[in-house]
């Protein structure tokens, strides 16, 4: 496994719609493993392949620990070609952040429950119903695969404020 560089705003690759994965091979499995390692290293709970510059419909998540023999262990999820097939008509608001927009958070309104179809790392078809943090994470990461960022769900004013801050931060970085 290897750490990958996470692409940051305003890199235009983040706006790219990712391509479907046709077959699973060792390269795809290595990418998924690298994505998990990169996500954990960045203290994130989700990562899309487009965030590391890879044009593939791949996401990884770990929204919490699961109990196993009285020990808490990581609970990673790897999804290939994820597709949301159901969005609840009820909504929740939750603070979101993004590894590609570090240091910025905002309250985002999203459906409170989703059903997602995907393939696992063995290319077996799966379905998962998710709510709470996992449901939000799935929506957030699939948005990345469609070139959508969490700031796109904000009001125009809030989005512009964050974009101005990012621009200022980038100017300050370039001066250093």
Q: Each predicted region: which residue ranges?
A:
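Positively charged
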Residues: 1-176
């Amino acid at each position: 496994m290897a750490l990958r560089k996470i692409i940051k705003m305003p890199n235009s690759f983040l706006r790219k719609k990712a391509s479907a994965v046709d077959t699973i091979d060792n390269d795809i499995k290595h990418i998924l493993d690298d994505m998990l390692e990169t996500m954990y290293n960045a203290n994130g709970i989700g990562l899309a392949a487009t965030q590391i510059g890879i044009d593939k419909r791949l996401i990884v998540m770990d929204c919490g620990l699961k109990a196993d023999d009285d020990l808490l262990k990581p609970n990673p999820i790897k999804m290939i070609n994820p597709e949301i097939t159901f969005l609840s008509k009820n909504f929740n608001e939750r603070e979101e952040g993004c590894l590609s927009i570090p240091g910025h958070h905002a309250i985002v309104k999203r459906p409170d429950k989703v059903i997602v179809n995907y393939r696992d790392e063995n290319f077996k078809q799966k379905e998962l119903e998710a709510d709470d943090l996992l449901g939000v994470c799935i929506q957030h990461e699939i948005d990345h695969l469609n070139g959508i960022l969490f700031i796109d769900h904000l009001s125009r004013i809030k989005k512009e404020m964050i974009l101005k801050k990012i621009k200022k931060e980038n100017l300050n970085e370039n001066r250093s």
